[in-house]
Amino acid sequence: MRKTLLATTCLAALLSTTAHAETTITTATTAPVRTSTIKSGAPDDIKITSTGSVKPTSGTAVTIDSNHKAINEGTIEISNVNGARGIVAEAGTVGSITNAATGKIIIDEPYAPTDIDNDGDIDGAFALGSNRVGIATLGAFTGNIVNSGAITIEGNDSAGIRLGGPLTGNFTTDGTVSVLGDRALGVGLQDVAGNVRLAGTITATGLDATAARVARSSSRAT
């Protein structure tokens, strides 16, 4: 049974550092980036502007592994790779994660289900790949997490946003989150010590799919 749930080149040449201690990515790169080394080997905040993109061939596109923030106003994309991640914050870090209104995080695959027997109903698996996540934390994280843009994920056992530990800060998603695949999860939260806002559109499509799951919260929902 199908189940659909709806709730409303050289990297150095591509980077610049602004006066307020923020390293910006303004053009396309295929190299993954980390807050701990983004500023010529030194730590800094990362901002992908609307003209910038990070599109590695595998792994995690943006990693927060120091006490800094990551802002995406452009495009983060990985295609057809199991285990791929868009933005990941390592356990114990302090900062913030923002997928802005113009930001896109796409972790997808070329496969698309079709109507094999021409009965007007899509046949076959929803997705072939697995374990893909748009935004993730690997443990406790301190700082706000905001999605006002678009997160598109294709893969079984995959998630749009999945927190792997408690969040000390506010959580907001008022953009779009779309996940396709069996056991898909749109948004998954652990304990949140802050405000939680689930708005915009959250879509999880597949067998045993879940649009939103909040394991526990000491926050105020809005």
Across the structure, where does each feature detected by a protein language model lie?
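Short, surface-exposed polybasic-and-hydrophobic patches located at secondary-structure transitions
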Residues: 65-71
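Short, basic/aromatic recognition patches
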Residues: 92
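Beta-strand-rich solenoid/repeat architectures in extracellular/passenger domains
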Residues: 22-31, 44-58, 71-83, 96-131, ...
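Structural detector for internal amphipathic alpha-helices that build alpha-solenoid repeat scaffolds
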Residues: 133-136, 159-163, 185-189, 210-213
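Flexible, active-site-adjacent loop/turn segments at secondary-structure boundaries
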Residues: 4, 165, 200
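Gram-negative bacterial Sec-dependent N-terminal signal peptides
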Residues: 1-22
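Charged, amphipathic alpha-helical stretches
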Residues: 61-63
